[in-house]
Amino acid sequence: TYGGHGEQMAVFGSKVKIQGKPLSEIIGTDALPQEEWEKLRTDVVQGGAKIIQLRGRSSWQSPAYCSVEMIRAIMGGEPFAWPAGTYVKNEKYQNIMMAMDTTLDTNGCTYKMPEGTPEEMALLDASYAHLCKMRDELVTLNIVPPVEKWNEINPNL
């Protein structure tokens, strides 16, 4: 998933392969009817809520494990090449923290734009718009400074 976290996640399935066959060729067939794919996407987006429902609390093991793997990558271990939240400022998305196609290694965090279908990219655009709205609300409430002043706090932004 890319973009925001929670209901505004952009679930990308177009690069997934099942037994060597692209998922996009399976969706809408008897093997994976469109309705089942939609349910699967919903289950991915609502996975955290399901864990809380089943356990009565959030899961801490997976984030803890990923954190250790991220630290290991930055310290010289195998690169961590899973989507992760990163500060994004490019031609399309400006001044936002969102999950991207990232790699963490001894050079830090780098990202590239996810590649997806037009529908997936539209979901990512919608997720970005939602994140911008949330960011702008935080600015309005004086919780964070206006974007144009961020580089006063961190000159790398």
Question: Residue locations for each model-derived region?
Answer:
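Long, compositionally biased stretches enriched for glycine and/or charged residues
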Residues: 1-157
